[in-house]
C-alpha cells in the first residue's frame, strides 16, 4: 500500500514512459505485486487455471522480447509492525476465521502461490532474490546499490527505503503499453521533498506500519508544515517537539498602519501620489504588485510568522497527544537496511523439458503449445550468448532467413530454425522439422553473421537476375520513336492500281446475293469515278494542269479530309449525319478492289433523306475521286485513249450481267411499272430482261437500286433515277450542253458508249431540288454508288407539287442530239487545253466549291420537300464566281451560265 496520499503528492513529477523505452534496462520486479494483480482479474477466474502463472509467463515473454531484463524479488518475513495490517488484509480477502487467534505475520497461502511462481522462474531461467523483509525494500536496495535501473512496484514505500526510480501502473495494452515513472531527483527538485521528508509524511499521514498516522493531520496541513520548515529536517523537528512540548507563545503584534492599495506598502495612495513611496523608491506615485506579494513591513512579517506558528502549533499539539509519537520503530524500518545480496544475479537458459512438465502439471498446457511459447525465449537467450562470444553445441541453429519483417517499428528477420531437443510438435503435423520465429535483425546479425552473409549474397544474386531479365524482356507496349515513325513514313508510297476495272462479271454479284440490297451494294466502286456529279470537272482540270496525278490525289484527299473535319466540328451539325456516316462501314470496304461483293449489309437509315445524302456525299466522294485518279493512271498509259475505257466500261458489264436476270427477280413495284410502261412486249413473270429494250434495262437498274436501304443513287443526292426515266433524253442533252460550255470531260466516249449510258457531270450532291421531271439522272445503264439513304418510293412522283410539274416540263430529244452534245464537249475540252488561264480559273472555282459545300448542304437539305423559287442571275460580271458561290443549285447555275453564254454569243 505504501504511504497514504503519497502518489497524489507526487503527481506533478509523474512521467509517461513507453515500454520500448525500457529496452536495455534491468528492472527489479516485486513478484507479489504481479500475483495480486492477476488474482484480482475477474475474467480470468474460473476460465484459466493458475492465472497468476499465466500472467507471469506472458509478461516475462513480452518484456524479454523488448530487451528488458527482469530480476524478481521474493517476499520475506514482514516486520511485526505490519501484523495488524496483514490480519486485516487476510480478513478482507478470505473472510473472518471464527476463532480468535493471536496476530501472526505469516503468509502461508500467499507464500504457496509465490513458490509456484518461483518454480516457473526456474524453468525460464529468470533470476530472483529473496528479500529479508518487504519486497519493495529489497527492490530499493538493488536500485540504490546499482544492481538494477529501477523498481517495478505500486508501493510508494520504495522511495522511503531509498529507491531512486520507481515504475508503477504497468500496462501491456496493445494500443499504449506504458508505465508511470517517478524519480527521486525530480521529486526533490520540483517538490522539495527528500527521503527524510517522505518518511515524516509517512508518520503524519500513515503507512503500512502506521495505518492511521497522526489523527487530524491531512495532506494539505502536512505540505504547509513542510513549507514552514524551508528545508529543515522534518524528523529532527519531530524530536524537538518531544523535547519541548510547551507551545511557543506568539509575540505581540505591532499596530497596523495604513497600506497603499496599489503597492501594498505603508502609506495612503494620496501620499504616494504626492510624495512617492520609500519602499518603491519613487518620488511620485508607486509601483503596483501582485496579490501574493508580501509587504516587508514589520506588521506583515509579524503577522506571517504568527500564522505559521499557529499551523505548527496545531500539528504539534495533535502529534504530541498521540501515543508513541514520533514512532521511532517506523522511522527505523524505513531508514535501516536489512537486505543483502547472497548470490550474483545470473540468467540461465530456459529448460524446455522442465517447462513442458511444469505447464502440463500446473497450467494444463499441451506440450506442443508450451514448446511453441517457449521457443522465442530459447532463441533470444542463444543469440545473446553468441553475441557475447559464448557458443555451445546445444544452441539453436538457423536453417535460413525467410524474409525481412518489421515489428513495432523495429527491423526484424523471419528465421527458420532447426528443431531443438525435446521439442514436441502437434500430432496433426509430425513431419514439421523447421520452426519459424521473428528476431531482431541487429541481434541476429551479431549472433549469426554467417547466415546473414549467405542471405545477403542470395539477395544480390536474385536482384542481378531480375535486372537481367528486365533488360532482356521485350517491351510489348513500346511505342515507336519519332525518328522511326518518320523513317517509316518516308518509305510509304501511294502505288497506282494495276487495273482499274478487272474483268469480272458483275452478274455474280447479283446472282449470289441473297437479297436485292446486297446485290445493289456489290457494284464496283470505280464506277463512281465516272458518275461523281460534283468533282468530275474539277478533277479533269487539275489533271491537265498537274503532271503527277498521284501527288495531286494526295493533296486533294488531305484538303477534303480537312473540310470534312471542319464540317463535323460545326455545332449545328445533326447527330443524324454522324449515324449515317457510321452506317457506311467504310473500314470494311476493299477500296483497292473493283467489286464490293463482300461488302456487309447496311441497316436501313430512318433519318431524313436529304440529311443522309449530304453527309454521305461529303464523306465518300473524296475517296472516290482519288480512286478515279488511280484507276485513270492504271488503265491508260497514254492520255486520251478511249479504247481501254470502252473495253472496261463497267456499265456495259453490269448490263450484260443483268440481262440474264428474270423479271420475277425484280421487286413487285418495278414489275408493275415495266408492264404498264411496255404493254406491247407482253412481259411475263419469268421473262428475262434481255427481251426488254435498253431504256427499260437502265430504268430497272435504277429502280432496283433505289428500292434498297443502301442503294447507290442515294449517295449522289438529288439524282432520283426511279422517277426521271421519262425525261432521260431531255436531261442528257441538257447535261451534255452544260458540260460542254463549262467543263471538260476526263474521258472521251465513243458513240456506242453514248448509246448505252450517259454521264452526269458537275451536279452538286445536295443542291438539286426534288423535282420528279427535271431532277438530274442517267436514264440508261447507269451504275450507282453505295448509299445508306432512305429508299424513295415511286409514288413520290404523284405527290410532287403541281407547280414543279408545270414549270419544268420539257420536250424529249433524240439520241442524235446527245451525240452532237458529246462532240461539242470534246471541242470545248480541246479549247480549254489551249487556254490554261481559263482552266486555272475553273480549278480555283472548283476548290472554292469544297469550302462552300457545307453551306449548300445546310441551305438546301430540304429542297426535296419544300421547293423554292430561285432568282436567275444574268450579269456578265458574275458569270465566273456567281455560278460557284451562288446559293442556287448547281443545275440552275449551269443552266443560267449556258443561257448567258448563248446570249453573249448572239450579241457578238
Curated annotation (Swiss-Prot):
Biased composition (Basic residues): 465-476
Region feature (XPG-N domain): 2-96
Ranges where the record places region Disordered: 460-482, 629-650, 792-834, 853-886
Bias-annotated ranges (Basic and acidic residues): 824-834
Enzyme class (EC, first level): hydrolase
Domain of life: Eukaryota
Annotated region (XPG-I domain), positions in chain: 122-208
Localisation: Nucleus
EC nos: 3.1.-.-
Primary site of residence: nucleus
GO molecular function: 5'-flap endonuclease activity; crossover junction DNA endonuclease activity; four-way junction DNA binding; magnesium ion binding; protein homodimerization activity
The entry's keywords: DNA damage, DNA repair, Endonuclease, Hydrolase, Magnesium, Metal-binding, Nuclease, Nucleus, Phosphoprotein
Tissues in which the UniProt entry reports expression: Expressed in bone marrow and testis and to a lesser extent in thymus, spleen, brain and colon.
Positions contributing to Mg(2+) 2 binding: 155, 157, 208
Sequence positions bearing Phosphoserine: 794-795
CDD domains: PIN_GEN1
Residues holding Mg(2+) 1: 30, 75, 134, 136
A GO cellular component annotation in the UniProt record: centrosome
Entries under InterPro entries matching the protein: 5-3_exonuclease_C_sf, GEN_chromo, HhH2, PIN-like_dom_sf, XPG-I_dom, XPG/Rad2, XPG_DNA_repair_N
Assembly notes: Largely monomeric, dimerizes on the Holliday junction and the first nick occurs upon dimerization at the junction.
Family listed: Belongs to the XPG/RAD2 endonuclease family. GEN subfamily.
Full protein name: Flap endonuclease GEN homolog 1
Organism: Mus musculus
Record lineage: Eukaryota, Metazoa, Chordata, Craniata, Vertebrata
Name of encoding gene: Gen1
Amino acid at each position: 500500500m505504501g504511504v497514504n496520499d503519497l502518489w497524489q503528492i507526487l503527481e506533478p513529477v509523474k512521467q509517461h514512459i513507453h515500454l520500448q523505452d525500457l529496452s536495455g534496462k534491468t528492472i527489479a520486479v516485486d513478484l507479489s505485486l504481479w500475483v495480486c494483480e492477476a488474482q484480482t482479474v475477474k475474467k480470468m477466474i474460473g476460465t484459466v487455471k493458475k492465472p497468476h502463472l499465466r500472467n507471469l509467463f506472458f509478461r516475462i515473454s513480452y518484456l524479454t522480447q523488448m530487451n528488458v531484463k527482469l530480476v524478481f524479488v521474493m517476499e520475506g518475513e514482514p516486520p511485526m509492525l505490519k501484523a495488524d495490517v496483514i490480519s486485516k488484509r487476510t480478513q478482507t480477502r478470505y473472510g473472518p476465521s471464527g476463532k480468535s487467534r493471536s496476530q501472526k505475520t505469516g503468509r502461508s497461502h500467499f507464500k504457496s502461490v509465490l513458490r509456484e511462481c518461483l518454480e516457473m522462474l526456474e524453468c525460464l531461467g529468470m533470476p530472483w532474490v529473496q528479500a529479508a523483509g518487504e519486497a519493495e525494500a529489497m527492490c530499493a536496495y538493488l536500485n540504490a546499490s546499482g544492481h538494477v535501473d529501477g523498481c517495478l512496484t505500486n508501493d510508494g514505500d520504495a522511495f522511503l527505503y531509498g529507491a531512486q526510480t520507481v515504475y508503477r501502473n504497468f500496462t501491456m495494452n496493445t494500443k499504449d503499453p506504458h508505465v508511470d515513472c517517478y524519480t527521486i531527483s525530480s521529486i526533490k527538485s520540483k517538490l522539495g521533498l527528500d527521503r527524510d521528508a517522505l518518511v515524516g509524511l509517512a508518520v503524519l499521514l500513515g503507512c503500512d506500519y502506521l495505518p492511521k498516522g497522526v489523527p487530524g493531520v491531512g495532506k494539505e496541513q502536512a505540505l504547509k508544515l513542510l513549507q514552514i520548515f524551508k528545508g529543515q529536517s522534518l524528523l529532527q523537528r519531530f524530536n524537538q517537539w518531544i523535547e519541548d512540548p510547551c507551545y511557543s507563545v506568539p509575540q505581540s503584534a505591532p499596530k497596523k498602519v495604513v497600506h497603499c492599495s496599489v503597492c501594498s506598502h505603508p502609506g495612503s495612495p494620496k501620499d504616494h501620489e504626492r510624495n512617492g513611496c520609500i519602499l518603491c523608491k519613487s518620488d511620485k506615485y508607486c509601483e503596483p504588485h501582485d496579490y501574493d506579494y508580501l509587504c516587508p513591513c514589520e506588521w506583515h512579517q509579524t503577522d506571517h510568522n504568527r500564522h505559521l506558528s499557529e499551523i505548527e502549533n496545531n500539528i504539534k499539539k495533535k502529534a504530541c497527544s498521540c501515543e508513541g509519537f514520533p514512532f521511532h520503530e517506523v522511522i527505523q524500518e524505513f531508514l535501516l537496511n536489512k537486505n543483502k545480496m547472497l548470490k550474483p544475479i545470473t540468467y540461465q537458459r530456459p529448460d524446455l523439458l522442465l517447462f513442458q512438465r511444469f505447464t502440463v502439471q500446473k497450467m494444463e498446457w499441451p506440450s506442443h503449445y508450451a514448446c511453441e511459447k517457449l521457443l522465442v525465449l530459447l532463441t533470444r537467450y542463444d543469440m545473446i550468448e553468441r553475441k557475447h562470444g559464448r557458443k555451445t553445441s546445444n544452441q539453436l541453429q538457423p536453417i535460413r532467413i525467410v524474409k525481412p519483417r518489421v515489428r513495432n517499428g523495429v527491423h526484424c528477420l523471419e528465421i527458420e530454425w532447426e528443431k531443438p531437443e525435446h521439442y514436441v510438435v502437434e500430432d496433426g503435423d509430425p513431419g514439421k522439422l523447421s520452426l519459424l520465429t521473428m528476431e531482431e535483425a541487429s541481434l541476429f546479425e551479431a549472433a549469426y553473421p554467417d547466415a546473414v552473409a549467405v542471405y545477403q549474397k542470395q539477395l544480390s544474386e536474385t536482384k542481378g537476375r531480375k535486372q537481367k531479365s528486365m533488360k532482356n524482356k521485350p517491351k510489348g507496349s513500346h511505342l515507336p520513336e519519332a525518328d522511326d515513325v518518320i523513317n517509316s513514313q518516308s518509305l510509304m508510297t501511294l502505288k497506282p492500281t494495276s487495273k482499274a476495272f478487272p474483268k469480272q462479271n458483275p452478274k455474280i454479284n447479283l446472282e449470289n446475293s441473297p437479297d436485292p440490297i446486297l446485290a445493289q451494294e456489290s457494284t464496283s466502286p470505280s464506277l463512281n469515278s465516272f458518275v461523281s456529279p460534283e468533282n468530275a470537272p474539277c478533277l479533269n482540270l487539275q489533271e491537265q494542269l498537274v503532271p503527277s496525278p498521284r501527288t495531286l490525289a494526295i493533296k486533294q484527299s488531305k484538303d477534303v479530309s480537312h473540310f470534312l473535319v471542319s464540317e463535323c466540328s460545326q455545332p449545328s451539325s445533326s447527330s443524324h449525319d454522324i449515324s449515317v456516316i457510321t452506317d457506311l462501314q467504310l473500314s470494311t470496304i476493299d477500296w483497292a478492289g473493283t467489286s464490293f461483293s463482300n461488302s456487309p449489309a447496311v441497316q436501313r437509315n430512318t433519318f431524313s433523306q436529304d440529311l443522309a445524302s449530304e453527309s454521305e456525299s461529303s464523306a465518300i466522294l473524296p475517296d472516290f475521286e482519288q480512286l478515279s485518279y488511280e484507276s485513270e493512271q492504271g488503265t491508260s498509259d497514254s492520255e486520251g485513249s478511249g479504247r481501254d475505257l470502252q473495253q472496261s466500261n463497267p456499265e456495259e458489264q453490269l448490263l450484260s450481267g443483268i440481262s440474264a436476270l428474270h423479271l420475277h427477280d425484280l421487286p413487285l413495284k418495278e414489275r408493275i411499272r415495266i408492264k404498264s410502261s411496255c404493254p406491247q412486249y407482253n412481259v411475263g413473270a419469268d421473262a428475262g430482261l434481255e427481251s426488254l429494250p435498253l431504256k427499260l434495262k437502265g430504268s430497272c437498274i435504277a429502280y432496283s437500286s433505289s428500292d434498297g436501304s443502301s442503294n447507290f443513287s442515294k449517295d449522289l443526292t438529288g439524282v432520283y433515277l426511279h422517277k426521271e426515266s421519262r425525261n432521260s433524253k431531255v436531261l442528257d442533252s441538257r447535261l451534255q450542253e452544260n458540260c460542254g460550255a463549262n467543263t471538260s470531260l476526263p474521258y472521251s466516249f465513243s458513240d456506242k458508249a453514248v448509246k448505252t449510258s450517259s454521264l452526269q457531270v458537275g451536279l452538286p450532291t445536295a443542291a438539286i431540288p426534288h423535282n420528279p421531271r427535271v431532277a438530274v439522272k442517267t436514264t440508261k445503264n447507269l451504275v450507282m454508288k453505295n448509299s445508306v439513304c432512305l429508299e424513295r418510293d415511286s409514288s413520290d412522283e404523284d405527290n410532287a407539287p403541281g407547280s414543279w410539274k408545270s414549270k419544268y416540263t420539257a420536250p424529249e430529244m433524240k439520241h442524235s442530239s446527245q451525240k452532237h452534245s458529246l462532240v461539242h464537249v470534246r471541242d470545248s475540252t480541246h479549247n480549254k487545253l489551249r487556254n490554261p488561264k481559263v482552266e486555272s480559273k475553273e480549278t480555283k472555282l472548283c476548290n472554292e466549291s469544297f469550302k462552300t459545300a457545307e453551306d449548300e448542304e445546310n441551305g438546301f437539305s430540304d429542297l426535296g420537300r419544300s421547293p423554292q423559287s430561285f432568282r436567275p442571275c444574268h450579269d456578265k460580271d458574275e458569270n465566273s464566281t456567281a455560278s460557284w458561290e451562288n446559293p442556287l443549285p448547281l443545275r440552275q447555275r449551269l443552266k443560267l451560265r449556258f443561257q448567258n453564254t448563248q446570249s453573249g454569243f448572239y450579241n457578238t
